[in-house]
Structure formats: C-alpha cells, structure tokens
C-alpha cells in the first residue's frame, strides 16, 4: 500500500512539474544592428490571478547591456506580448560587440524576479543567443544602361531605404569593382534625398568583362547591395538578329523523330524587317562552352519579310554526329549551339546572333519540389506543392502531374495514385490523407505524359514522444495575393484528451515577427490572416501549443503571388503610338502619393549587343532583396518544436529548451545526388582537342589552330611560345588546322543597284536635321504629386526606347514601374556612314541608303547641302532623282572632294512629299596633308641681366612644310612658374593632364593621371592658394585623382602587385611606384588601406638577404630603373623601393597593420645599410647616387651614411652660372645622348636635356631640400629644372615629369612668398600686314592671365624686350605638317609599313585569311553562291568582331593588309619599350580581331594595342636587332579615291624624340588611287589647281595684253620667272618640279633670284598639271610661305598662278606663230624692265 501511495505521489509531482509555469521567449534568430528587433514574451500555465512583471533587453555575452530595457506585464488572462528592442548604432562599440568579431553573438535576456521565486530558476534571468549582423535597411543600385564601351561614362543611382522600405537619409559607401574583381573606386557620400546620383568613367584600357557597383550604409558592412554591368567594345547595331527554336529543348530519346527547327528573324531596331541573307552554322557545346562544329548542317537562306526558317531532319543530324563519333546517348548535358550572320542587302551591314541555351534533354520539363514539406503529420492531410517549368525556365501551364505516394507503416506499404494539372503559372498543389499509423512517405512525382520528368522525395513523420502532432492545412492551397484573407486550419492530432485551451501562432516576414496571437481550441480551429504588403513576398505561419509540458509546433511557408509594389507608379506615353525623331513626347507619370520619380530611357539596341544579361531593376529584384531578410530555411515543419522554430528563423527559449545558436545568415544546403554522365563524349567532341586533357594544353591547341593576320609558318609561331609544355600542342594543332584550310577559295557576286526619277517636293527648311544619337537619355529625378505630365524632345535615333521609372515615397516606399516602350521611326528615312577621317583633296564616295516603309513608291530628290570646303556635283544643288520602291531600300552614290583644311559639317537631304523626306547632319573629319611636326624652344627671361633684356627669336624655315597649311608659332610667357605649372589646367584638369604627356600608355604611364594632380593639390594646399583659382578647380582635381586611381587598378594583380600589362608578370619597380602614389592619394580616393598593405607585403617579399631588392620582371624600359646596368641598377631599384615604402607607412594602422609597419621599418633599415655600403664604395653613377642620397635623407638614415651619399652626389654635379644639374657620367647606359652645350648668352634658348638628366637632377633637388632647405644649391638646381619644361609644363616622359614636378613643388613650397614682382614683355614681329606688337604686363601672383599665349607667323622673326624685376619664361611651340620625313633620324630605329591588296595577300599566303562571312550580298540572295566551307563558318566568331564583314561585293577591293616591320641598329643600347603609331589610310579601320590575335595568343607578337581614330598603336616590349614584322587587316567601309600617303612613327616610349618617321602609300594600281569624281565635281576639286596654257598651239594672240592684265591687275603677281624644268619628284600629296631660272621678270621677297639658280614649284597630286622635264615655262604668281633646304623660297602652283609653256625656236619660225611669239617676247621684255605701272 505504501508503495502505491508513493507511486501516486511521484506521478502527481511529475505531472505538476510538466505543467509548471513557464516564460516563453521568441525572437528572430538574427539581430540587425540599428534596426528594431521584435521580441515575443508569453506566460504559460500560470495560476489565475498571478501577474508577472519583468523586462527584456540585449546584452554582450561577456556582460554589459547593448539596448534599453523594455518592460512587460503578463497574467493568465493577458498572457503574451510583442515588444521591440534595438541596438543603437552609437552603442555598438561601447557595449563591446566589435570585440566579438569571431563569435558575433548577442544575448536576448528576459529578467524578472518571478523566474526565481515562482518558476524555480536559479537566477531571475532567462535568455537565448542571437546572431548579430551589421546589415540594415534596403539598398538598390541602378545604372543608366546595361553595357558600356571602355572609356564611357557610367551614370548610376543608389536608392536608400530603411527596414520598412521607407526613404532613409544616411552616409553611403560606394565601391566599384572591375572585371577581375579588383576594387577601383571607393567613396563615401551623404544622401539627403534617399536617391544618390553619381558618375564615373570606365578606363579606356579596361578589358572586357562584368563590372560591379556596390553600395552600403557606411556603418553597415553587411548591408551591401550591388548591380552588374558589362564592359566590352561594341557598335550599336542597325538591326537585331534573333534565333528562335520551335522548342526550347531537343529530346534525345531514340524514338523521337521530330525535326530540329528554328526561325531566324532580323528586324531593324525601329521594328521593320530586314532584307538580306542569313548564314547559319551549328555546333555541340559542353558545360565549359567548348564547341565542336557539326559539318554538313551549315545553311544560307534568303530573308522574306525579315524571316527565314531552318529545318534539320533526324537523318541529317545523325549524319553530322556520325562524322565526329558521337551517339545520341552521349548528348545528355550538352547543348546545340547555333550562330547566324545576317547581311542586309541595301547597305551590306552585318549583324550576328547566337543561341547557346538549346539543351539536349530526356524530358521537356523541370520539376521543383522544394516547397513540399519534409515532415508529415499522421492522421492529417499531406500537401504536395510542385512547380513545373519548361526547359527554357518559363512556367509550364496545364501539364499533368502524377503523384504515386507510397505510404509506409512499419513493414507494410500502400501505393496511391493521384494526378492534377498545373495552373497558369506552373504550380500544382495536391492534398491526400495520411492514415494515423503511417510513419513515412515515398513520393514518385512525374510531370508530362509522353517524356515525363521524374522526381523522388522521401518524407518522414517526426517522432511523437507521446505529445501528438499539430496539423496546419490551408483552406485554399493556392498562393494568396496581397489583399486576400488566407485561412488556415489547425488541428491537434494523436492526443486523446488535449489539455490545452488555445493555439498560439506567429507570423514571421522580412526577418521580424509581424504578429503574435492566439486562437481558442476547437475540433477544427481556423485562423484568418489578412495578407498585406508587409508580408510580401513570403511569410512563415508558425503555430504551437503545450501538451504535458512539452511544446508541439508546426510551420508553413506561404509564398504570395507576385504583384505590383505597395504604392503605385505608372508611366504612360500620351498620344501617338509611334513618334518621329525630334518630336516632342508627352510622358504621363502617375503615383498614389507624393514621391520622387527617377527616370531613364535606354536604347533597346543595347540589349542586342549583350545587355540582356544584366536586366534593369524591376519589382522581382526588389522582392528578392526584401525576401533576403527572411532568415527561415525550408518549406516549414521539423522533427520537434525547437527545430520548427529554428527553421522558421526564430530563436526560442522556455527555460528548459532552446533553439541552437545560429552560425551564419545562410541556410544549410540540401545535398543533391547527381547522375554520372558518360564522359566518353569528351574524346569524341574533337579529334584534335581530345588529345589533350589539361585546360592549359587545350588552350595552347586552340591558339595554334587560330589563324594569324600575317604569314608565319607553324614552326615560326611555335618558336615564340615561351612555355615548353605549351609548344608541342600548339605546333601540332597549328599544322592540323593549316592542312584543313589550305585550298579554300571564295567567289563573289556584284551587288546590283538601281536609281530612278521625279516628284513634288517640300521645302528643305521644313525637314528636320538629325544630329543627336545618344545611347540613353531622360536621366532625371522628377518630384510628382499624384500626377505629372512631362514634355520632352526625343533624340534623333531611329530606334525603340525603353523608359524606366523608380519612385520613392515617404508613405509607400519604393516602386518600380513596368517599362514603357516608345518606337521612334520614320517610314521614310536615310542612313549615312562616314569614314573616321579623310585628307584634303581625297575623293570620297558617300553611299546613303534610303529606306521606304510606306505603301507607295516614292520619288525623291537627294542632295548634299552646299558647304564651303566641299566640292559636290552642281556645287551641291544638283540632286539625284530616285524612285524608292515601297517596302524596300535603295543606296545612292555621291562623290565629294574636301578642299578645306578644317572639319566640314556635311548635311544630306532627301526631299519628297511630307512623309518622304529626311535629313542627316554629320561632321566630316578632315586631316591635313603630310604628317604633324612639333618643335619646342624655351627662353629664360631675366630683366635684371643687361644682356638678357633684348632677344630675337628667328622664324622657322623648314623646307618640308606643307604649303597652304596652318603653320604658326605659339608663344607663351609667364612670370609665375609655380602657378603656371601647378595651378593651371595642365595639372588640374583631365584635358590638361592629357596634354602634359601626349603618349598613350601602360600601367606606369597611367600614373600620370594621378601624380601631377597630387603634386599640384599638395602645393596649393600648403601655400593656401586654392582661393586664387576658380571655385570648382579643387573638385576637378579630386575627380581627376579618382579617375587615375580607377585606371591604375586595371593593372593590379590579386596579390597586390602591378605589372606593365595584365598579361605581364609583376614588377618590383612598378609596384613600388604605385604604392608611393596611391599612398599619397589615400585621402582623395578613399582606397582601402588593406589593399595597399597587400602591395607593401608583396614588395617586402622581393627583398634579398643583403638588403637589396630584386625585380622578377623588370619594367619594359630598363633605363628608367636607374639609368645604369649592373650594380647601379640594383642600387637605384632598392632606393626607389625604400622611398615608396616610406611614403606607404601612413597606411599602416592598428591590429595586423602594426606588425606590418614594424616589418616595413625593419626592411627600410636593412635596405639603407645596403645603400650606404654602395655609396661608400664610390662607384655609383649620377642617377643611382642621386636617388640613394634622397632615400637615405628621406628615411633619416644614420648621419654617416647620409654624408657619404651627399658627398658622392655633389662630386658629380655640373655647375654653369646660375644652374646646377647632374648629367652624363661614366657607366651610363644612355651613351647616345650628348651633353647640351652651355648657353653662350642669355639671349639664346635653353638647351634641352634628356629625360635621365632631368630625373637625376630632380632627385638631387629633393635631397638638397631635405638636407639644407632652400639654399643656393637648391636654387640653382630648381632654376635648371624650371627651364627644362615643355610648352605644356611637362618634361620628356613619365618618370622625369613625375619626379621633377614633385621636386619643384617642394622647392616652391619652401620658397613661397607674398612679395609681388612684375614683368613687362614686349613682342613685335613683321608680317604681311606690317609690324605686329604685343605688350604683356605679368606678375608672379597672377591666376587669371597668369600666362599669355600669342600666335605669330611661322617664318617671322620675333623681337622680345624684357623689363621689370621678376624673372620669367618664354616658351615657343611650332606645329606644322611636313611633306616628307627626310629630316627625322632613322639611323637607330627603323620602321617600314607596306599595304597590299587583300586578294594579293591571300594568294601569296596560300590560304584565305578572310575567313567566315566574307560573302557577297546581292539584291537577289536566291542567286546561287559558292557555299561557305564548314571550317570557315565555324571559325567565324573567333576571327571577326561585329561590323568587320565586307558590306558589298566590290568592297573586297577596299580591304587591305598591313605589314609593319621594325628593327634597330645593333650598336644601339636600346632595350626598352617602343610604340609603332600607324596612321591608317583614309577611310580605313583596323580589324580588331586581327589585332587581338597579335596580343592574346600563346605566340604573342605585340604587348598591347590601342586604336584612336585613324591611329593604330602597337606596343613592343623591345625593338629587335633583326627585322621583325607583324600584320593585320583593314577595311574601308566608305569608298575613298586618290588616297594620299599616311605616316607611321616608331619611337622609344621613354624618349619620344628618339624616333623614326616614314610615309607609306596605298598599293600601286589599286582602286584606292583611282578617280571617283566626274564632271563638275572634278572641276570644283581642281578649281584651286593651276592650268597650263599653250597659247601658241591654240593660236591665241595677245592683242589685249592679257598676260600684263593677269600680272598687274587681276592678281598683281609677286614673282615672275621663265624656268626650265629639271626633274619631277613626289612627296606626300605633292609633286615637286625642280626648275632652273632662265630669266627673272619680277620678284618681291625672292631677292636672291638670278639666272641659273634653281627653285622648287609644287603642285598637288590631285591636280592634273604635269610639267615636262627639259621644257621651258613662264610662271607668275604669289610668293610662297615655305623655303627649301637652302633657304630659297618655294612656290605653290594654284589657280592664281600663270603657267605657260614657252614655244620652241622652231615653232616661232613658222609663219602662223611668228606674231604670237613677238607678243610673248615683248611682254617678257616690258615686264622684266618696267614691271607693273600701277
């Protein structure tokens, strides 16, 4: 009996303990700092009438409160409450959270005396650990277009919102990463309107790839959001090609007999169909994107209404597979690749498209069961939720889904069969009952009937533990919409006699508990949830109860059907559905609240060139960001209550149980089984590529197969491959491909052209001229209150614009409008292409294409509007009448000849009726004949020196000057060297810094964007002179520094080092240079110190045991590392690195950086010891001595070391008067530079020293300033450096400019004074119009007018008078075009450029290098053409870029091949980088694919290339001693005749004056030299040409004295000679006739003219005039402005020149010529003796 009573007592005690009072604590498992945290507190099983008081708060696990306390009061009747806590950002540091980075947890604590007194706790606190995150709010980033060219400006917006999606004003941190993932820009900006707008420029040297703009709240590291955009070179297409397969998949089941079918569509961007031919090819593509060509499937087809259809039968496809030994079963996982090139018939333009998503599959569908719960409730219904998509990714509607569940109950099982069709969005929800005894469920699900997709899923019942289960069943299994009431039924299952009275539930969305409530228990309890915007896009419904002291819980994830935003934003174009270019468009913006609306319009043509991969911001992206705050994992449910809470994103504690502490923000990934694929197909994909297994070997093989744009044997190519492992596959595959393409040929067919006649016209003034063609516009933010009507002018592009809008409202948050499209189109319009540039008197053929989409044929008049400087038919007013058939296009040809020396606006007009007129205006870029020559001279102005108060500057008399050119002398005078150099646009503006150095560049030269501006900013900061400049100057300077920083990051490697090119290994010297400059720029660019610390760490790893530094890959120009070889080179490099590390010390801060700082300081000390030893040995050259002395002084090395280095340096100084410099010393590498002669008097120009001398003296000046301050020696060194600057303030190259500006800035800061000094300079020159005088009043503090730039005649002597008490500088810049290059030094460097016709080159190469689409475009594409060979079609995409295909048949003749050869004199010690700058023949552009082959393959021939207008720049690591040639193709899109020779220059990168310049011409007998003009166009072009008179032959008598009237009245000639022509010579675009004077009739300036002397007479090659040798002529005209190499005048023969062939003695003896001969002799006698009596 006692035993029974005892057992009863124990049982009652346990029961009471299970039902003991509890405090339940709920919250999201993640705390976002600075944002509210919802906390649910519930009192459970408390006796009636009992009241519990307490508080909740957040604290550091180590102690210390992190949030204010929130009180609560609970009772049995009011037993739960939802509170809000927050960790203020300002308290994060004080509560010690930042010290817990490795364990980022915070504790949620409930505190109440009740816990200890009544709940039997040891303490009065109960808590749970939460993960904390600095993420808060929402950020969205938007760019103005999805794709950019390198060099383009990117406009972007950042929208900042708080946790509730409302506008937030805060500091934002913006970062930009390039395609290599390296950060190139970082800035912090405060946004006051929640919409930040800013811009940055992509460096022009950027490699193709995906860039990223990221934004975050500055105090929230994890709030980062980003957007991506593409960077690549592209041209906006005129039309778009689309490939649409009939099915988005290809079934690879053996029984499938369907044909493979696809449609090709080509439409102009404005929506109209394209006429032309489509060429299509196919390949198999694996997961890595590698393609294997399917021979025999290539097709060509005519487009009908812009469409064509391609069908491949099963047998055709199988035959293609058989050729490469591939079976149908091997196709799984592969894709069928299709590429189409369309050539339009009217204009011959080509566009391409490719299809890469066409998969081989075993089923047409994919099946997603991720929304199906993994736990079932025995005795309740189970809900299977599936999403069925087509292989393309779109929802599959009305697809039968069959479910065969196997119910497992112990060892028994039962199979059911259920089926249902998917709804319109591909969803299906199937519910079926589960018997109470079932413990598991095996699901077999199939989608589709014929070839179904099958998925399997196993579902288990959670262990009951005797507490039963909770079933949650939605009344309607479909996803609700915002505004719906969603009903869920709750039922306790497996509990015989429930002991609880209520179900409790929570709604969790966006990482917060949105609601907490309870519902009284009934047999079936229904809960209604009103779905509002705050629950979108998904929420968890979590319900629970306690039974016998144990929690029972379940949850369900409910996805809300996508809908528009909380507010309203609609964009609607009012009025016409279609607009004309230039029309005023009305855009209606409608909102439902006061909002800011950010707009933007994008040309949809950008999507055609790859922009679709980066879609614009839309609501799906917005919901994706919102949903990212949902910290729940899975579809709901769990093994037990804590797991249910945890998977729903909750942290939970009831005193006895708690959820596991969350480790990170992400969910654990579900393991997926992956079927093994048959790997045998890899060998079968390609007989050749399959021989190589490693990716590197495969790449080498592919490189070998790729054709070069020049002739090289495979053995020659392989010899250039540096890696031995790469050489064998490269050679083998090269020979393999060479055999395949050996005998390929092509045919061509002419393009027929039509011209027709006549109609009634409208006035030309009524035709809108199209001139504006942006890629995006309407980038603006508009305040809108409910509605606003914007009226904007549409750009001139004929395209479809997509208008985007994003609104931000304080009451409704962010909303993204559905884009609206506006088609801008003229049913009749013209399209015109112009060449990059042409030269004067070259003949240009314009070929505008007229497009007529009207229903009627149109009679149209087409003409070019008259403009001065352009010869056209009828002076431009003669029109061509054509009939453009309805629905077609017609090209029209015009010949024009530019005669102006400046750019000409060219306006083309098509005049018809009101609906058939159009006009386009473009600028024709005109280049002058010959090549540009620059000459710079510097004079020192010192009025205090009596000998220097007067000086004369002689004019230039270069015999090579092009006549009638713009040749002038520019004079710049300044009295303020510091402000002129460092306060001018040259140092503080983008255009100015570009003018400092006119060189293009690699990584080192890129630093010129940073260094001068940094130096200038430092000078103006230190001397407080920003106020003397315009207010925006400092902003410009900061922008320029940031731009330079972005640019240099393109060369950064992942380890922090830098190389001259991305493909080149890192350089110690260059990395040190960048470290130094970026350390100084830290404040302006906001660069991460960690990045610079990586750079410094890399440098430390390059230090050797003796303290010196070595360079694993020296910069290309070795001389710039110290000017000397051997030990001097090592010394200079070590000193350079020491200087860089010293400047980098300021970026080493707390933590790890302190250790790195100690390492850097130790490294500097070690290096200084090495430098001191070398300086003590006394064997250093001047440059190494100077940089060593500066490094030791800068780093404050021991005094002994500094003194030794100083004495060694001063022993090498050269002192001349007021100047001190360091020049050539024994051991210098630069033996070709001679010492400049000291000026004999102050009136002579300052001798210009080489770059190395300037850099050496600059380092010496920096050393002297640190050692002695502003002393005499520093004054003299600064004086010498000051007068070495060029016209724009720079010096010879990058390094000497950077170091010298640094040195002079330091000197000018030390010598800055407020004392004002004045300088008066008087310049006078005698010109054609008499004496020209300028008086300049300057002072040393002038800003506006700190310098005067004047223009004088090139040949005039300039007299200069100097007065005042201030020194100054006078700089001369002469620029003019020269006829030939005979005056340039080509003894050391040599360059040769040869241009050959493409056909000639192809035959000589024994193969057709114009592979792929070089096919004729005809008016009737159905005319049989020679088919394209498989290899040619397949190689097409690799060998050509967009718009590099021939446009019409005859343009094949306008394709040429360039061969560029370079070499140097073997005795020349030049080992540095050189640049070949080739100016292309007019109208040509280089084929970019050819240039890329020279730089990107394993056998690299060129380090880098750039194209700039008509220029192609090729970078060579070095110039070989033997002749080395590279080649590339060029295409002339616009026909040009009488093409003039162009120039090419090879120059040393660091000494640009060390160069070789040559001219080259078009191929002889080429159509490029043919005459295109006819009739009056030729007459106009020759209007300035001289005419040869043969008066005697035409029996014209001089009765009225027309010779005398011409000489004295019409023109009043300035010279008159009879001459005998000796020889003819061609130079550039001129013919030279060297002639001997036989009689002097008259002269004005040619005072030395006498009988027997020779003179040169010049005529343009475009003129027909030919003077025959050994014949005598009478020539009279105007004086020339040029002289020959003897200083004698040269005369240009033009329309104002009298040229008459003198009759022979025999002719004058004849009777019929006797009178005329006497008249001629009388004129010669009278004019020579009396001249003009006027």
UniProtKB/Swiss-Prot annotation:
Q: Which cysteines are joined by disulfide bonds?
A: 66-95, 633-667, 700-726, 701-733, 714-734, 1461-1525, 1573-1578, 1585-1663, 1608-1732, 1708-1717
Show where the Anaphylatoxin-like domain sits.
700-734
Q: Which residues are annotated as pro-peptide in the record?
A: 674-677, 1437-1443
State which residues carry a glycan (glycosylated): 224, 743, 859, 1128, 1383
Classification via InterPro entries: A-macroglobulin_rcpt-bd, A-macroglobulin_rcpt-bd_sf, A2M/Complement_sys, A2M_N_BRD, Alpha-macroglob_thiol-ester_cl, Alpha-macroglobulin_TED, Anaphylatoxin/fibulin, Anaphylatoxin_comp_syst
Q: What GO terms fall under cellular component here?
A: axon; dendrite; extracellular space; synapse
Q: How does it assemble?
A: In absence of complement activation, circulates in blood as a disulfide-linked trimer of an alpha, beta and gamma chain.
Q: What does this protein do?
A: Precursor of non-enzymatic components of the classical, lectin and GZMK complement pathways, which consist in a cascade of proteins that leads to phagocytosis and breakdown of pathogens and signaling that strengthens the adaptive immune system.
Q: PANTHER family, from UniProt?
A: COMPLEMENT C4-A-RELATED, MACROGLOBULIN / COMPLEMENT
Its name, as the record gives it, is: Complement C4-A
In its UniProt entry, the species of origin is given as: Mus musculus (Mouse)
Q: Which gene is transcribed and translated to give this protein? A: C4a
């Amino acid at each position: 009996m006692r035993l029974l009573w005892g057992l009863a007592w124990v049982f009652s005690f346990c029961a009471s303990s299970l039902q003991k009072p509890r405090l339940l604590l709920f919250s999201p498992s993640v705390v976002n700092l600075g944002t509210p945290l919802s906390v649910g507190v519930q009192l459970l099983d408390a006796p009636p009438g009992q009241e519990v008081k307490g508080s909740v708060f957040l604290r550091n696990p180590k102690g210390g409160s992190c949030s204010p306390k929130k009180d609560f009061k609970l009772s049995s009747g009011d037993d739960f409450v939802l509170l809000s806590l927050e960790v203020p950002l300002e308290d994060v540091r004080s509560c010690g959270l930042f010290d817990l980075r490795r364990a980022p947890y915070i504790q949620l604590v409930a505190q109440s005396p009740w816990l200890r007194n009544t709940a039997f706790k040891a303490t009065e606190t109960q808590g749970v650990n939460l993960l904390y995150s600095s993420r808060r709010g929402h950020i969205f980033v938007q760019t103005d277009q999805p794709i950019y060219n390198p060099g383009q400006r990117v406009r972007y917006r950042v929208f900042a919102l708080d946790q509730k999606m409302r506008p937030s004003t805060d500091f934002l941190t913006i970062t930009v990463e390039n395609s290599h993932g390296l950060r190139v820009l970082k800035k912090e900006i405060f946004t006051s309107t929640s919409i930040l707008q800013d811009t940055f420029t992509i460096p022009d040297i950027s490699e193709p790839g995906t860039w990223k703009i990221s934004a975050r709240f500055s105090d929230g590291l994890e709030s980062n959001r980003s957007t991506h955009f593409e960077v690549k070179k592209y041209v906006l297409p005129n039309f778009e090609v689309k490939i649409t397969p009939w099915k988005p998949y290809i079934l690879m089941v053996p029984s499938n007999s369907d044909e493979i079918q696809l449609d090709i569509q080509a439409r102009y961007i404005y929506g109209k169909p394209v006429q032309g031919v489509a060429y299509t090819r196919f390949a198999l593509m694996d997961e890595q994107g590698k393609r294997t060509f399917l021979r025999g499937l290539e097709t060509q087809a005519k487009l009908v209404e812009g469409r064509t259809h391609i069908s491949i039968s099963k047998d055709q496809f199988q035959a293609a597979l058989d050729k490469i030994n591939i079976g149908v079963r091997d196709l799984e996982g592969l894709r069928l690749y299709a590429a189409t090139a369309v050539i339009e018939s009217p204009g011959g333009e080509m566009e391409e498209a490719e299809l890469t998503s066409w998969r081989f599959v075993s089923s047409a569908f994919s099946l997603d069961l991720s929304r199906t719960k993994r736990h079932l409730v025995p005795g309740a219904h189970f809900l299977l939720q599936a999403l069925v998509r087509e292989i393309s990714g779109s929802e599959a509607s009305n697809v039968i889904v069959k479910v065969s569940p196997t119910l497992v109950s112990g060892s028994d099982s039962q199979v059911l069969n259920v089926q249902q069709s998917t709804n319109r969005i591909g969803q299906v929800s199937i519910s079926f009952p589960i018997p109470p005894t079932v413990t598991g469920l095996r699901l077999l699900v199939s989608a589709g009937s014929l070839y179904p997709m099958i998925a399997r899923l196993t579902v288990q019942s959670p262990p009951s533990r005797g507490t039963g289960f909770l079933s949650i069943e939605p009344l309607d299994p479909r996803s609700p919409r915002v505004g719906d009431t969603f009903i869920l039924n709750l039922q306790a299952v497996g509990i015989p006699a429930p002991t609880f009275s209520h179900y409790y539930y929570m709604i969790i969305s966006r990482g917060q508990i949105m609601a907490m409530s309870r519902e009284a228990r009934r047999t079936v309890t229904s809960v209604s949830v009103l779905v509002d915007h705050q629950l979108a896009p998904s929420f968890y419904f979590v319900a629970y109860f306690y039974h016998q002291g144990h929690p029972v819980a379940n949850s369900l994830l409910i996805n809300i059907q996508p809908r528009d935003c909380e507010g309203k934003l609609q964009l609607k174009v009012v009025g016409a559905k279609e607009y004309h270019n230039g029309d005023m468009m009305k855009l209606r913006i409608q909102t439902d609240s006061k909002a800011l609306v950010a707009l933007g319009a994008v040309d949809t043509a950008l999507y055609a060139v790859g922009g679709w991969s980066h879609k614009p911001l839309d609501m799906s992206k917005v919901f994706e960001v919102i949903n990212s705050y949902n910290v729940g994992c899975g579809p709901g449910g769990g093994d037990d209550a804590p797991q249910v809470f945890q998977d729903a994103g909750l942290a939970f504690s009831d005193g006895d149980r708690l959820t596991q502490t969350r480790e990170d923000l992400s969910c654990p990934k579900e393991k997926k089984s992956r079927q093994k694929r048959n790997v045998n197909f890899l060998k079968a994909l390609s007989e050749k590529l399959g021989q190589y297994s490693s990716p590197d070997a495969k790449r080498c093989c592919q490189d070998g197969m790729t054709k070069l744009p020049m002739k090289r044997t495979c053995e020659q190519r392989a010899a250039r491959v540096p890696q031995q492992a790469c050489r064998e596959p490269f050679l083998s595959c090269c020979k393999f491909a060479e055999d395949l393409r050996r005998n390929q040929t092509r045919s061509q067919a002419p393009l027929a052209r039509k011209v027709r006649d006549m109609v009634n016209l409208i006035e030309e003034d009524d035709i809108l001229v199209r001139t504006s063609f942006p890629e995006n516009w309407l980038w603006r933010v508009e305040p809108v209150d409910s509605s606003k009507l914007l009226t904007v002018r549409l750009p001139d592009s004929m395209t479809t614009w997509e208008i985007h809008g994003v609104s931000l409202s304080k009451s409704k948050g962010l909303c993204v409008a559905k884009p609206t499209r506006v088609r801008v189109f003229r049913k009749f319009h013209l399209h015109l292409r112009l060449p990059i540039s042409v030269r004067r008197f070259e003949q240009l053929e314009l070929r505008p294409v007229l497009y007529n989409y009207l229903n009627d044929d149109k009679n149209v008049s087409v003409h070019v509007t008259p403009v001065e400087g352009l010869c056209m038919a009828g002076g431009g007013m003669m029109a061509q009448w054509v009939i453009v058939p309805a629905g077609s296009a017609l090209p029209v040809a015009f010949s024009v000849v530019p005669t102006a020396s400046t750019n000409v606006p060219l306006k083309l007009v098509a005049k018809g009726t009101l609906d058939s007129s159009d006009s386009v205006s473009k600028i024709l870029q005109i280049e002058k004949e010959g090549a540009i020559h620059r000459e710079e001279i510097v004079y020192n102005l010192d009025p205090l020196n009596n000998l220097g108060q007067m000086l004369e500057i002689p004019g230039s008399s270069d015999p090579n000057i092009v006549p009638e050119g713009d040749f002038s002398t520019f004079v710049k005078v300044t009295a303020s060297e510091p402000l002129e150099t460092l306060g001018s646009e040259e140092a503080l503006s983008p255009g100015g810094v570009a003018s400092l150095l006119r060189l293009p560049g690699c990584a080192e030269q890129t630093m010129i964007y940073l260094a001068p501006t940094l130096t200038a900013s430092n000078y103006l900061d230190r001397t407080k002179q920003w106020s003397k400049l315009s207010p925006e100057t400092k902003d410009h300077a900061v922008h320029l520094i940031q731009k330079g920083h972005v640019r240099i990051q393109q060369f950064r490697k992942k380890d922090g080092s830098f190389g001259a090119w991305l493909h080149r290994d890192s350089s110690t010297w260059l990395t040190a240079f960048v470290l130094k400059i970026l350390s100084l720029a830290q404040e302006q660019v906001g660069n991460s110190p960690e990045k610079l610390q990586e750079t410094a760490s890399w440098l430390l790893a390059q230090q050797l045991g003796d303290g010196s530094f070595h360079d694993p890959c020296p910069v290309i120009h070795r001389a710039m590392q110290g000017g000397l070889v051997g030990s001097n080179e090592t010394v200079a490099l070590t000193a350079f690195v020491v200087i860089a590390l010293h400047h980098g010390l300021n970026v080493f801060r707390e933590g790890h950086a302190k250790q790195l700082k100690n390492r850097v300081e130790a490294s500097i000390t070690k290096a200084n010891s090495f430098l001191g030893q070398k300086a003590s040995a006394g064997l250093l050259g001047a440059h190494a001595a100077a940089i060593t002395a500066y490094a030791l002084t800068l780093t404050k090395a021991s005094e002994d070391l500094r003194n030794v280095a100083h004495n060694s340096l001063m022993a090498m100084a050269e002192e001349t008067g007021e100047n001190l410099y360091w020049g050539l010393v024994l051991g210098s590498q630069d033996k070709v530079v001679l010492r400049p002669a000291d000026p004999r008097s102050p009136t002579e120009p300052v001798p210009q020293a080489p770059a190395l001398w300037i850099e050496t003296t600059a380092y010496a000046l920096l050393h002297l300033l640190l050692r002695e301050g502003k002393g005499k020696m520093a004054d003299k060194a600064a004086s010498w450096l000051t007068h070495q600057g060029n016209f724009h303030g720079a010096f010879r190259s990058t390094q000497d400019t950077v170091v010298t500006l640094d040195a002079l800035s330091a000197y000018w800061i030390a010598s800055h004074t407020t004392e004002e000094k004045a300088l008066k300079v008087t310049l006078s020159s005698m010109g054609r119009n008499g004496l020209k005088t300028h008086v300049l009043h300057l002072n040393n503090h002038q800003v506006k007018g700190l310098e005067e730039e004047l223009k004088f005649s090139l040949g005039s002597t300039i007299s200069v008078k100097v007065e005042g008490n201030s020194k100054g500088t006078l700089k001369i810049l002469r620029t003019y075009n020269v006829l030939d290059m005979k005056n340039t030094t080509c003894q050391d460097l040599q360059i040769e450029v040869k241009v050959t016709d493409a056909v000639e080159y192809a035959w000589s190469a024994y193969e057709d290098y114009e592979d792929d689409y070089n096919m004729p475009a005809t008016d009737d594409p159905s005319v049989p053409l020679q088919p394209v060979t498989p290899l040619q079609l397949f190689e097409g995409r690799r060998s050509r870029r967009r718009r590099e295909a021939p446009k019409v048949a005859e343009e094949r003749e306008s394709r040429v091949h360039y061969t560029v050869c370079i070499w140097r004199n073997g005795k020349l010690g030049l080992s540095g980088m050189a640049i070949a700058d080739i100016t292309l023949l007019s109208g040509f552009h280089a084929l970019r694919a050819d240039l890329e082959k020279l730089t990107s393959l394993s056998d690299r021939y060129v380090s880098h290339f750039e194209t700039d207008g008509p220029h192609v720049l090729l970078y060579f690591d070095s110039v070989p001693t033997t002749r080395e040639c590279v080649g590339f193709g060029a295409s002339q899109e616009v026909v040009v005749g009488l093409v003039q020779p162009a120039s090419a220059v090879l120059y040393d990168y660091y000494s640009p004056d060390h160069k070789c310049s040559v001219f080259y011409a078009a191929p002889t007998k080429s159509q490029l030299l043919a005459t295109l003009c006819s009739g009056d166009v030729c007459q106009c072009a020759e209007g300035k040409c001289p005419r040869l008179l043969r008066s005697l032959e035409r029996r014209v008598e001089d009765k009225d004295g027309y010779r005398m009237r011409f000489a004295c009245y019409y023109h009043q000639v300035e010279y008159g000679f009879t001459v005998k022509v000796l020889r003819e010579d061609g130079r550039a675009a001129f013919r030279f006739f060297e002639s001997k004077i036989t009689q002097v009739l008259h002269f004005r300036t040619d005072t030395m003219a006498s009988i027997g002397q020779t003179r040169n007479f010049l005529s343009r090659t475009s003129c027909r005039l030919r003077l025959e040798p050994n014949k005598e002529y009478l020539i009279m005209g105007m004086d020339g402005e040029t002289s020959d190499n003897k200083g004698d005048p040269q005369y240009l023969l033009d329309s104002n020149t009298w040229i008459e062939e003198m009759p022979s003695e025999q002719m004058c003896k004849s009777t019929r010529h006797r009178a005329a001969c006497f008249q001629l002799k009388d004129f010669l006698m009278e004019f020579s003796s009396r001249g003009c009596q006027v």
